[in-house]
């Protein structure tokens, strides 16, 4: 049969049944030649993982399966191998040889042995052989007889030398698998080396090894099935039979934990043993009764062992120091006692000196009970306890050896500090001048002790010495193996640390039986110890409800990892015994109060109606503003950072009512550690969170929870306050209410103009570097973008970097109108489409882009910019030009002398002033009059808009605006008298009228008559009145044309670019103020939507239905949204709009 080549030279075997073939003569010889040419490492070069004691069940099965997969198992042929016997071997009959060809039989001391005829690599397998294996537990000793009985099988297998499982001389394994016998080498076998095998029966799962493990351990011989195992123990017991047994273990009798090295056991006894916890009451009582036993107690605070004599105690101290008794310190090094000025040159001498302080000395300190041999040493030591330079009184010293001892804890703590710090110096791996916290404190104490005099001692040195700054828990000698962080002591008493993580130096290739049994004993030990321990059952008892409980914070965790993270980072016990944590210097122990010293109001009173001015005509606006001086205190890392910056402006406020303001219309919820909480949360005695049903032990922890972790921290501010019973109508809207399309397209000053009333205009102005401060009362036109809050620290992140504003100074010019507009903008989320422009961009800014719809439906041309779209509609669109010609022909019939009046700027200015004075505003109008024409004031439902238009016209320094205004009159469509007083702006019945208002005939006729009084061609330099034939508000669809064209016919309009138009228009203002660049001096005759010569309201309404951009189209077509008044030329865009963006969804987001 053919054999495939292999990458590594390895013996190829065949089943025993194939030995009859004729190939038996040539194959072993060829194989032997190939293998002999290969250089195989000897036994010592192979990894230790193939040692018998380190060979796991997985490794054995690997070798077994490897032989099975290769299909190479064999046994050699006796006839062919008989010719290859070495001549130097003793005469052995090979006629009966039935073993493999790589092996041969020889006799030594009259016994038949099996040896290798050539080098054999690890993993060489022979088999399978028919046979049965019977184990004899007594025969597993070294040099035992054959531990099995073969009912059938090869005879050579009986001649193999058998050893115990743990003998290191083993080089092969014989195992039973599936009722058949196999033999595999576990080491590299050289030529002529004897085969020494051990037995493993996989069918019986190593019953002998398991029994031996139980009988030779600490615990009595009990079978695992007789013990009630935990689920974790059952999993460990399943892999225990395959574990390697290690005799060199070091058990802890207190905990039942086995260690593979004595060093690990010593570290466990020092830091982690459950017996190391000191019981305070019994120890103190015992010491009070038996003061002579002080010398027999271990001075380490972590150890509770007692000894009968000093020698035994010295031997025990050796385990703490980690050095031998005979070792001396390096040359030039010394150990100084922190109790006195003694210096030792060896560790044993230093220990003996420490005993002198604990034994019955002649002089004993009354404070710490340390003993001293001379009075001078006692006086030097008592200097540490005296707060001033005075010597202690005679009553402080005791010349009697039988002094009362209240507690040994201070003495043992100080002794432990001195002993451990000096012992760490004595370690070879420790540097004598290390800069750890212990060494620093120790050096300071040593310097003080060596320089002091018994008579005179400065008081400053005494104050430098501090017992509390020295950590009582010493650092672990092996940082890599210690789960406790160095220099960080536990804040609660703990038992043994039961780590679930394996450290790198403890990870081995195969599982150790000692480790498995130790973990199993740990689980049992936890159950047995539960209930009798003095420390809290944090991680010891599986009988607890679930998880671990932090008793300081009264929080139960169902995951141990979460508990440990909580104790390390969040537990309230971290703040005990320290005013400020060194790791968190910016966090104080007490939460600072976010109350302004300049005002008696706090953030709790933000929604209190008694703290604000009342307006009987506007009951919904009584609590819409907060005290701005209170809000000013909410900035900065500690809540009072910018108080000085705003102190001068706050002093300028005339009255307390005049300082009422609100940021974006809602109480500020600043994300600061000292941020304001509502009334119930600021109670210093409140520790229970009703929303989360958690009770905290400290108010500070409760405050941190409410600020960062509470489930209600994302709710609107009014929803948080359970104590403030604010009426439903006084509450603001949701913070994250989504703005609709018609709201986004409005300038911020015009979204809710009816809420701007004259009685709220008496608030003094805050200085603003971006605006002028000459006029005391400003209009809506001067208000900055409401998203730019009045604090420099919380300017919205969507502001462009080119914003001409220094964030280190107060941003806004908070005028009278803004204090109310900001209230209106409160519930609107951040509009990322509204970018604040820089100063250079404000002078040349075009109208605000009308969403993203810039397509001329008549010409089927789309534009990327609004400027290009408007220019097209003004100059190139054929429908616009046609309407311009038609409207121009009507001008001569309706207005007899339009040119003469248009050419007279004085007359036009006078007429505009007359129309503005009719509305009650003596100020000069602004260009916003193009939107709110004077004829609109005659309409019954739009009188408020006329007032808003006059407020807008009170200031014309529009170049300082943060927001480039666009005169979008869509809000006129949805405003209806008193409805505008509601801050919700929900869906009203008037919103569903098809793109127009329901206007009474009398109102239309009155507006028509009023408009007929003014000539149509009047120039719009001041912008208050728009004399034209139109008597109805302009349609939102044509808002771009309204802004640019202004609704006037332009007979003398120069064909110049928008910048030139702006320059020419700015020169026409009488008050010398500049107008914004987006106001176009384009006096077209009339609006495209409305036919100018309509005498009655029915004809006017029918003219409104005239199509978008001048095209006659029914509003009820399939691509026209009547509610939003938007025409779509694509059905898919229309469907997407109705599904996601239509204003009909507004009611869905108001809760």
UniProtKB/Swiss-Prot annotation:
Sumoylation reduces transcriptional repression activity. Residues 18-33, 70-79 have a biased composition (Acidic residues). Zn(2+) 2 binds at residues 550, 553, 566, 571. Zn(2+) 5 binds at residues 1121, 1124, 1137, 1142. Zn(2+) 1 binds at residues 252, 255, 268, 273. The CCHC FOG-type zinc fingers 1, 2, 3 and 5 directly bind to GATA-type zinc fingers. The Tyr residue adjacent to the last Cys of the CCHC FOG-type zinc finger is probably essential for the interaction with GATA-type zinc fingers. There is a cross-link at residues 324, 471, 915, 955 (Glycyl lysine isopeptide (Lys-Gly) (interchain with G-Cter in SUMO1)). Expressed in heart, brain and testis. Weakly expressed in lung and liver. First expressed at approximately E8.5 in the developing ventral heart tube and septum transversum. Cardiac expression persists throughout the remainder of embryonic development in the atria as well as in all layers of the ventricles (endocardium, myocardium, and pericardium). Expressed in the neuroepithelium of the developing midbrain and hindbrain from 11.5 dpc and increased in intensity between 12 dpc and 16.5 dpc. Residues 829-835 are annotated as: Interaction with CTBP2. Zn(2+) 4 binds at residues 856, 859, 872, 877. It comes from Mus musculus. Disruption phenotype: Mice die of congestive heart failure at 13 dpc with a syndrome of tricuspid atresia that includes an absent tricuspid valve, a large atrial and ventricular spetal defects, an elongated left ventricular outflow tract, rightward displacement of the aortic valve and pulmonic stenosis. These mice also display hypoplasia of the compact zone of the left ventricle. Zn(2+) 3 binds at residues 689, 692, 705, 710. Keywords: Activator, Cardiomyopathy, DNA-binding, Isopeptide bond, Metal-binding, Nucleus, Phosphoprotein, Repeat, Repressor, Transcription, Transcription regulation, Ubl conjugation, Zinc, Zinc-finger. This is Zinc finger protein ZFPM2. The keyword Metal-binding applies. A motif (Nuclear localization signal) lies at residues 736-740. Its main location: nucleus. It is found in: Nucleus.
């Amino acid at each position: 049969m053919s054999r495939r080549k292999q990458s590594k030279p390895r013996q190829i075997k065949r089943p025993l049944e194939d030995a009859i073939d004729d190939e038996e003569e040539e194959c072993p010889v060829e194989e032997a030649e190939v293998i002999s040419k290969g250089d195989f490492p000897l036994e010592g070069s192979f990894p230790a993982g193939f040692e018998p004691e380190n060979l796991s069940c997985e490794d054995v099965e690997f070798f077994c399966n490897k032989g099975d997969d290769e299909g190479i198992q064999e046994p050699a042929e006796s006839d062919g191998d008989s010719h290859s016997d070495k001549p130097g071997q003793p005469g052995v009959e090979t006629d009966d040889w039935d073993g493999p060809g790589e092996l041969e039989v020889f006799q030594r001391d009259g016994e038949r042995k099996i040896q290798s005829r050539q080098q054999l690599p690890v993993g060489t397998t022979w088999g399978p052989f028919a046979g049965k294996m019977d184990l004899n537990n007594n025969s597993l000793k070294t040099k035992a007889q054959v531990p099995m009985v073969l009912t059938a099988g090869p005879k050579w297998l009986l001649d193999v030398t058998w050893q115990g499982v743990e003998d290191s001389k083993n080089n092969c394994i014989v195992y039973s698998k599936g009722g058949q016998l196999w033999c595999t080498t576990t080491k590299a076998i050289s030529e002529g080396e004897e085969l020494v095998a051990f037995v493993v029966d996989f069918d019986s799962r190593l019953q002998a090894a398991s029994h031996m493990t139980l009988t030779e351990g600490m615990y009595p011989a009990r079978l695992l099935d007789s013990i009630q195992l935990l689920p974790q123990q059952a999993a460990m017991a399943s892999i225990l039979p395959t574990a390697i047994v290690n005799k060199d273990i070091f058990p802890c009798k207190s905990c039942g934990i086995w260690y593979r090295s004595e060093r690990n056991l010593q570290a466990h006894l020092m830091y982690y043993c459950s017996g190391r916890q000191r019981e305070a009451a019994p120890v103190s009582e015992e010491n009070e009764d038996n003061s002579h036993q002080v010398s027999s107690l271990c001075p380490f605070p972590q150890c509770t062992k007692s000894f009968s004599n000093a020698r035994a105690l010295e031997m025990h101290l050796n385990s703490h120091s980690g050095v031998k008794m005979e070792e001396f310190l390096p040359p030039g090094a010394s150990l100084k006692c922190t109790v006195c000025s003694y210096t030792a040159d060896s560790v044993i001498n230093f220990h003996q000196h420490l005993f002198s302080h604990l034994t019955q000395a002649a002089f004993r300190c009354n404070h710490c009970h340390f003993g001293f041999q001379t009075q001078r040493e006692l006086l030097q030591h008592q200097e540490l306890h005296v707060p001033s330079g005075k010597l202690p009184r005679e009553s402080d010293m005791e010349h009697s050896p039988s002094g009362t001892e209240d507690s040994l804890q201070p003495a043992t703590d100080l002794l432990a500090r001195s002993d451990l710090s000096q012992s760490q110096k004595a370690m070879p791996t420790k540097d004598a001048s290390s800069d750890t916290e212990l060494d620093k404190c120790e050096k300071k104490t040593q310097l003080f002790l060596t320089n002091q005099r018994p008579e005179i001692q400065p008081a400053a040195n005494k104050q430098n010495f501090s017992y509390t700054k020295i950590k009582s828990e010493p650092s672990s000698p092996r940082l890599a193996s210690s789960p406790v962080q160095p220099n960080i002591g536990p804040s609660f008493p703990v038992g043994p640390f039961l780590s679930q993580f394996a450290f790198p130096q403890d990870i081995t290739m195969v599982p150790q039986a000692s480790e498995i049994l130790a973990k199993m004993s740990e689980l049992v030990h936890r159950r047995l110890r539960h209930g009798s321990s003095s420390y809290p059952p944090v991680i010891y008892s599986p009988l607890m409800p679930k998880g671990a409980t932090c008793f300081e914070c009264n929080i139960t965790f169902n995951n141990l990892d979460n508990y440990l993270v909580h104790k390390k980072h969040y537990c309230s016990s971290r703040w005990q015994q320290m005013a400020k944590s060194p790791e968190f210097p910016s966090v104080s122990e007490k939460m600072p109060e976010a109350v302004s010293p300049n005002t008696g109001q706090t953030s709790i009173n933000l929604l209190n109606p008694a703290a604000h001015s009342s307006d009987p005509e506007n009951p919904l606006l009584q609590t819409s503003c907060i005290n701005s001086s209170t809000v000013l205190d909410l900035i900065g890392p500690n809540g009072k950072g910018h108080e000085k910056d705003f102190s001068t402006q706050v002093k300028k406020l005339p009255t307390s009512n005049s300082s009422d303001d609100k940021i974006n219309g809602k109480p500020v919820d600043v994300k600061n550690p000292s941020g304001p909480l509502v009334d119930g949360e600021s109670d210093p005695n409140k520790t229970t969170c009703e929303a989360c049903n958690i009770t905290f032990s400290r108010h500070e922890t409760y405050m941190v929870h409410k600020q960062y972790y509470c489930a209600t921290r994302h709710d609107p501010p009014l929803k948080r306050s359970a104590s403030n019973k604010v009426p439903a109508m006084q509450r603001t809207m949701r913070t994250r209410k989504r703005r609709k399309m018609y709201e986004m397209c409005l300038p911020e000053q015009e979204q809710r103009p009816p809420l701007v009333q004259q009685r709220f205009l008496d608030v003094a102005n805050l200085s603003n570097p971006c605006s002028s401060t000459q006029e005391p009362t400003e209009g809506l036109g001067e208000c900055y973008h409401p998203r730019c809050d009045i604090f420099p620290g919380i300017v919205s992140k969507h502001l462009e970097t080119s914003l001409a504003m220094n964030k280190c100074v107060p941003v806004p010019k908070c005028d009278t109108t803004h204090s109310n507009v900001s209230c209106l903008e409160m519930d609107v989320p951040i509009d990322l489409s509204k970018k604040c422009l820089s100063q250079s961009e404000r002078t040349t800014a075009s109208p605000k882009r009308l969403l993203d719809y810039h397509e001329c439906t008549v010409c089927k041309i789309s534009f990327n910019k609004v400027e290009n779209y408007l220019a097209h509609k003004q100059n190139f669109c054929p429908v616009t030009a046609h309407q311009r010609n038609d409207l121009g022909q009507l001008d001569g019939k309706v207005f007899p002398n339009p040119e003469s009046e248009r050419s007279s700027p004085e007359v036009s200015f006078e007429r505009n002033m007359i129309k503005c004075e009719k509305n009650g505003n003596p100020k000069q109008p602004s260009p916003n009059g193009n939107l709110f024409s004077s004829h609109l004031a005659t309409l019954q439902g739009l009188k408020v808009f006329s007032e808003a238009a006059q407020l807008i016209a009170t200031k014309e320094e529009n170049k300082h605006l943060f927001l480039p205004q666009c005169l979008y009159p869509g809000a006129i469509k949805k405003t209806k008298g008193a409805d505008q007083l509601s801050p919700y702006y929900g869906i009203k019945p008037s919103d569903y009228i098809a793109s127009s208002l329901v206007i009474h005939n009398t109102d239309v006729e009155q507006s028509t008559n009023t408009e007929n009084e003014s000539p149509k061609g009047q120039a719009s330099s001041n912008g208050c009145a728009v004399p034209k034939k139109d008597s109805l508000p302009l349609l939102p669809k044509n808002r771009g044309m309204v802004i640019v064209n202004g609704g006037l016919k332009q007979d003398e309009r120069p064909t110049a670019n928008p910048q030139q138009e702006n320059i020419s228009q700015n020169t026409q203002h009488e008050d010398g103020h500049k107008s914004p660049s987006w106001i176009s001096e384009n006096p077209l005759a009339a609006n495209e939507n409305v036919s100018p010569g309509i005498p009655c309201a029915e004809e006017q309404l029918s003219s409104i239905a005239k199509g978008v951009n001048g095209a006659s189209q029914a509003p009820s077509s399939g691509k026209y949204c009547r509610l939003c008044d938007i025409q779509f030329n694509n059905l898919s865009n229309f469907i997407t709009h109705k599904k996601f963006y239509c204003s009909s969804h507004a009611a869905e987001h108001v809760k």
